[in-house]
């Protein structure tokens, strides 16, 4: 429904939480961005592709109020993803060592498409930028990064993770 779509992108510092069936909702990124475990356990597919819109690494210490707000936004939206990636890495390593039964625990291959360099230059306010040129820039950046992923990792799909979870998320 339109209300569900609004709720899925509701940033609480900008909008009131939409009410759906007596419950109030905010952007799901505050709890799971994206929630990975339902994707893993509700399919037979071993591969999960994560398209990251928030950078993981920001190399500058925030000094201004706006920069601190941007860092809080990045941390809050990445924290659940990082936690899940660490859990997946842990389970995968136990499966590979033979300490967990692969018939009971799923060996998952993680792939990521990201634009760290481009996204780390954007502030939290860019999430509200509806300028067509900006949206075209995001679209073209995504298309370019998806093409790079396919060129470099297509053969990994169904065989192995193309993302080094320890290097990227620890």
Model regions and ranges:
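Short acidic-hydrophobic surface loop/beta-edge motif
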Residues: 14-20
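Active-site glycine-rich loop that binds ribose-phosphate moieties when present
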Residues: 2, 6-14, 28-35
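Non-catalytic peripheral regions of patatin-like phospholipases
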Residues: 23-25, 29-170
């Amino acid at each position: 429904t339109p209300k569900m779509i609004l709720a899925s992108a509701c940033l609480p510092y900008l909008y009131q939480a939409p009410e759906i069936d007596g419950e109030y909702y905010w952007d799901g990124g505050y709890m799971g961005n994206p929630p990975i475990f339902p994707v893993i356990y509700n399919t037979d597919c071993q591969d999960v592709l994560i398209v990251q819109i928030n950078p993981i690494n920001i190399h500058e210490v925030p000094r201004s109020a706006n920069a601190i707000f941007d860092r809080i936004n990045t941390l809050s939206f990445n924290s659940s993803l990082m936690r899940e990636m660490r859990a997946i890495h842990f389970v995968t390593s136990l499966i590979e060592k033979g300490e967990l039964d692969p018939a009971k625990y799923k060996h998952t291959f993680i792939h990521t498409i990201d634009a760290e360099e481009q996204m780390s230059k954007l502030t939290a306010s860019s999430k509200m930028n509806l300028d067509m040129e900006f949206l075209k820039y995001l679209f073209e950046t995504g298309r370019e990064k998806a093409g790079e992923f396919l060129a470099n990792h297509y053969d990994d799909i169904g065989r192995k993770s193309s993302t080094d979870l320890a290097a990227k998320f620890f």
